[in-house]
Each structure stands twice: as C-alpha cells, then as structure tokens.
Amino acid sequence: MKIKIALCDDDAKALPVIAGAAESAFQEKGIYTDIQRFNSGKALLQAMEQTRFHIVLLDIEMPGMDGIAVGKRLRELGDGTHIVYVSEAESRVFESFLVQPLGFVRKSNFLNDIAAVVELYVKTCSQDERGDYLEFQTRSGLLTLKSRQIRYIEGSRNYQ
C-alpha cells in the first residue's frame, strides 16, 4: 500500500529530516509513502488544487499563512485529508484542536510522537480511507470521491 503525504515546513533543513523519519515510521507498518515537500502554506494549498494527499504533516509557525490557518483552509475544502501538526510550538497544541488534527508531533520528541501518530493512523483509518479514491480534474479544481460514493458515470464527446 502507498499513501501520498504532503510535508509543509518553512525550515529547509528540517524538511529532509522529517520526511526521512516519517517514511521510516510508515514503512515499519508496511505502508509506503510518496512524500512531497512544501516550504509554505500557500504552496501546499496550490498543490492541493491538483493533488489529493492522505496526510498533511504541517508546521505551525511559518511566515505568511501559519499552519493553523492552513489547516482551517484544508477543512473548508472538505476533502478529508488527515492533518498532523509537526511543530516546536507546543504552546499552540490546544489551538490546533480547532482543526481536529489526527495528531500533534513535537519536534523535540519527534521519533516517539510520529510512531504514535502512525499507529493511530493504521488503527483508525480503514482500508477504504487509505485508498480506493477516484480523482477528476474539473474547471474549479480537483474533485476527489471515494469509489463507493459513485453510482453512475457517463462520458460524452471525446471522454472515455
């Protein structure tokens, strides 16, 4: 099984470290990852117009649009992406609850916290949630549907 993960952190040095550790934690559970890295919330949101991610690993304190604001915007989009905050801003953990994240990973305790979040993901997210999606490009952006939500598809003109 392979899942798509978006990693968003303004610290360029942290991106490869977090990506590598997250990839290892998921592989230990038999889940392979495709991790895309973003250095701003704006870049992440732009990418999400074209791509669906299963999980977003999101720093909180970033210039411009902070991680809480990005999380709120993701919830407004309503695609069911799981948000995991990865941050040194431990004092903002309660503020993150407004976004209903899957978890909060402290950078100071990263390896233990990421392992716990991966375990939670495996236990709470059914096979259907981790895969079995169809994506359609529309004029207004990317539309993602669970295959069980689709009752009928009709093509016209040059569509197949």
What residues fall within each predicted segment?
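Conserved SAM-binding loop
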Residues: L7, R37, Y85-V86
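Conserved acidic segment of CheY-like receiver
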Residues: K2-A22, V56
